[in-house]
UniProtKB/Swiss-Prot annotation:
Mn(2+) binds at D21, H209, H211, N245. It comes from Methylorubrum populi (strain ATCC BAA-705 / NCIMB 13946 / BJ001). This is 2-isopropylmalate synthase. PROSITE patterns: AIPM_HOMOCIT_SYNTH_1 (PS00815), AIPM_HOMOCIT_SYNTH_2 (PS00816), PYR_CT (PS50991). Catalyzes the condensation of the acetyl group of acetyl-CoA with 3-methyl-2-oxobutanoate (2-ketoisovalerate) to form 3-carboxy-3-hydroxy-4-methylpentanoate (2-isopropylmalate). SUPFAM superfamilies: 2-isopropylmalate synthase LeuA, allosteric (dimerisation) domain, Aldolase. Gene3D superfamilies: 1.10.238.260, 3.30.160.270, Aldolase class I. Belongs to the alpha-IPM synthase/homocitrate synthase family. LeuA type 1 subfamily. The lineage of its organism: Bacteria, Pseudomonadati, Pseudomonadota, Alphaproteobacteria, Hyphomicrobiales.
Length: 520
């Protein structure tokens, strides 16, 4: 990559697929409100294209894509579709209210996929490309075509497919490393060959889409840029199937930090990266690893004495970017029980959080309640309150009260009161430990067949009065959901997380009914 001046920078299109590919990882199901919150933040931070879902997959996905298309102000909204007429028609319908809509259609091209998944000949797949891309272009002006498993596709055949897609009206050509197999050298070379050999390649933008199975997703994406691609498909925090996707925040900050060798501009407001990371982490219920590049808790932490000495003398001795450049503030101890509405609203604005009047009122009341129980309320506490409000806005099952008897002798006992579908239920149950008793009490009120697959606890902030954040993953049949709950009381946080998971199962059409004998 050659050095260049600022004025010569190429524009790289950022295509975010957090709400589609990111949500495909097990347990990452988001509610409609959570998807809307993520989409609105992505739109505000400057993401060019938001792939909002797979409209044919379910009514919920169709509704999410349609609603996001109506709500977003500047981003192009894309709907995914297989190379099937019904899929393409459904995607077109879902994005028709967008300021700018895109249909993203795909078909397998590798020999192994054609033989064992598609069971089609190469010529038959070419015909499918011609027909389905033409259909999509009749519905929208902006059509993206993807060659599924491109990196394991014969290069001669890949060029034939790309030429056919562009000839049929595709405006973007995506060559994904679907199984995370390629190396950066191979991936960049593939783009150079295709662009050189396909006669109409100048009529489309080329796109990268990399999976992280070998830990090369970001490196491969950047190599694709060097090969001539000008769109990068990525997800916040790198969430996605298997080992995940290329991480948006890593892509953007790599380009910004190494502008000397990567002369590109992404148009992203990088000061919103940390907030986006936290929002997606909570909505998808996937914690960010502490040593995650850019947005991990330790990304700007220095413990080594030599490093600390250098940082105190000059920050650039060990930091290649500033915390402020990704939205991290050095101040956090400013809110308490005496803070009023104006101060709280100002703090939300500082954190990049926008709420409706009703949402603000509810979160402010929760903040005052928390401030009465905690000496200091940190930014992370406020973010947890907001995220919990967004996640539970339309819950069928809500926790009203919980008391637990625990000690070194005898069984632990939990007494719980919940509201479900507007009715109040009370039950008590024993357990082998207080958490077991809490979960047993929930099961007494809401019988279900879901299996607990994960239970984790960590502190949101420091100190003995810190809020506990509990993660719970439940599996019912083939459906797996993950949910979180936060509270200074670990047992209350556990109950909130478990009930939130049940609410997600309910939203996914898993049948849940309260025991009528417990009605009070």
């Amino acid at each position: 990559m050659a050095n260049t001046t600022e004025s010569a920078k190429d524009r790289v299109v950022i295509f975010d697929t957090t709400l589609r590919d990111g949500e495909q990882c097990p347990g990452a199901t988001m509610t409609l409100d959570e998807k809307l919150a993520v989409a609105e933040l992505l739109d505000a931070m400057g993401v060019d294209i938001i792939e909002a879902g797979f409209p044919i997959a379910s009514n919920g996905d169709f509704e999410a894509v349609s609603e996001i298309a109506r709500r977003t102000k500047r981003a192009t909204i894309a709907g995914l579709a297989r190379a099937i007429p019904a899929d393409i028609a459904r995607a077109g319908e879902a994005v028709r209210h967008a300021k700018a809509g895109r249909i993203h259609t795909f078909v397998s091209t590798s020999a192994i996929h054609l033989a064992h998944q598609m069971r089609k000949t190469q010529d038959e797949v070419i015909e499918i490309i011609l027909k389905t891309v033409t259909q999509a272009r009749d519905l929208v002006e902006d059509v993206e075509w993807s060659a599924m498993d491109a990196t394991r596709t014969d290069i001669d055949y890949l060029c034939r497919c790309v030429e056919a897609a562009i000839r049929s009206g595709a405006t973007t050509i995506n060559l994904p490393d679907t199984v995370g197999y390629a190396t950066p050298q191979e991936y960049g070379a593939m783009f150079r060959q295709v662009r050189e050999r396909v006669p109409n390649s100048d009529k489309a933008i080329f796109s990268v889409h990399c999976h992280n199975d070998l830990g090369l997703a970001v490196a491969n994406s950047l190599a694709g840029l060097e090969g001539g691609a000008r769109q990068i498909e990525c997800t916040v925090n790198g969430i996605g199937e298997r080992a995940g996707n290329a991480a948006l925040e890593e892509i953007v900050m790599a380009i910004r930090t190494r502008a000397d060798v990567m002369p590109y501009d992404t148009g992203i407001d990088t000061t919103m990266l940390t907030r986006a990371s936290k929002l997606v982490s909570h909505a998808a219920n996937f914690p960010v690893q502490y040593n995650k590049a850019i947005v991990g808790r330790n990304a700007f932490a220095h413990e080594s004495g030599i490093h600390q000495d250098g940082m105190l003398k000059h920050s650039e001795t060990y930091e290649i970017m500033t915390p402020a450049s990704v939205g991290l503030s050095k101040t956090s101890l400013v809110m308490g029980k005496h803070s009023g509405r104006a101060a709280f609203k100002s703090k939300l604005a500082e954190l990049g959080i926008s709420l409706s009047d009703n949402q603000f009122q509810d979160v402010f009341e929760r903040f005052k309640d928390l401030a009465d129980r905690k000496k200091h309320v940190y930014d992370e506490d406020i973010e947890a309150l907001v995220d919990e409000k967004l996640a539970t806005a339309h819950d069928r099952i809500k926790l009203l009260s919980l008391s637990v008897i625990a000690g070194t002798r005898g069984p632990q006992r939990a007494t719980m009161k919940i509201e479900m579908d507007g009715r109040t239920f009370t039950e008590e149950a024993d357990g082998n430990g207080p958490v077991d008793a809490v979960f047993n009490a929930i099961h007494e009120i809401v019988p279900h067949d879901a299996v607990l697959e994960l239970y984790q606890v960590h502190a949101v902030t420091e100190g003995t009065d810190a809020q506990a954040e509990v993660s719970v993953r439940l599996k019912a049949g083939e459906r797996s959901v993950t949910a979180r709950g936060a509270d200074p009381d670990t047992l209350v946080a556990s109950a909130k997380a478990y009930l939130s998971a049940l609410n997600k199962l309910s939203a996914a059409s898993v049948r849940l009914h309260a025991q009528h004998a417990a009605v009070v």
